[in-house]
Amino acid sequence: YRETIRKNKTYVSIGEAVVEIFKAPYSNDLRFDGARIYKGRKGSDVGKMDTILFKLQGGPVSTLQLDIVKNTESVLTLEAMKNYDYSLTGVVEIDEKPHYIIEFMQKPSVEIPLFMGSFYIEVDTYALTEAEFGFNLTNKAAAASIFIRKKPLGMEVTPEVASYRTRYREQDGKWYFAYSRAEVKFKVNWKKKLFNTFYTTMSEIAVTDRTTEEVIKIAGKEKIRPTDVFSEQVEAFTDPEFWGDYNVIEPDQSIEAAIR
C-alpha cells in the first residue's frame, strides 16, 4: 500500500505499508473487508504545507472500498443502475484477451454527484476484469461536502479531479481483487491570498499473495478504520530494506508495475 500528498508538483507526504487483508465473501453483503498494518513507514515535509496540515483518511481501507464487485451499492446494484446510462462503445485487448468496453454516466435528471467511467468485460467469460471511473464534479459545492471532513474558516477547497481504477486477476478459473488506485486533486484558495494552491492525494494497493487456509478475521483493535489517518499509524522511514528487492519504488511509479 502507498499514499502520497503533493502540494502543486512537490511531494510533501508519503506513506507505505505491507498490509494484511481479510477479504470477506462476495456473496455476503453483511461481512466487510478488513486490513491491518504488518509494517509501515512514512516521510513528510510539514514545512512545505504552509499553513495547511493536509491529511488523508482511510488508508488501505479506502482502496479496498474501490472493489466495486464487493461494494456494489454505488454502481452495480439494480437500484443504483436506475441512475445511470450505459453503452457498449467498443472492444479492446487486455492481457491478450478481447474485452467489451461498457461506458456509464449518471442520467441528466439525477442531481446528486455520482460516478462516470468504463467497465472492461472479458468477451469469453463476461468477467469484469477492470474498471476506470471518476466522480462527477459538475456540482463542485456538493462534491466538496463529500470529500472534505474539516477545513479552516476563510479557506475554499474545491475538488478538481477524482479518478479511480480497479483491476482483478484470474486464478484457477476465478477472478480476485488485485489492484486499486485513487487520485483526487483539490484547489485550495484563501480569501486573502492572490494565488491558488493545488493538493493532490494518491493512494493505491496491490495484492502480492493470497491464501484461503487458516483465515482468521482481523481483530477490531488491530483493524484500520475508515476514519483513521494512515500517516498517524506508522513511523518515520527507518527500515532500509522495507520493500526487500523492490526497496526503491519512485513515488510516480505504480506499485502494481513495480512488483510484477
Features from the language model and the residues they span:
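Solvent-exposed beta-strand/loop surfaces of large extracellular or lumenal domains
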Residues: 141-149
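Short, cysteine-centered beta-strand-loop-beta hairpins and adjacent loop/turn segments enriched
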Residues: 109-113, 138-142, 187-191
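Surface-exposed, low-complexity/disordered segments
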Residues: 1-83, 95, 148, 153-260
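Extended beta-strand-rich segments in extracellular/periplasmic secretory proteins, especially
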Residues: 67-122, 127-135, 166-170, 175
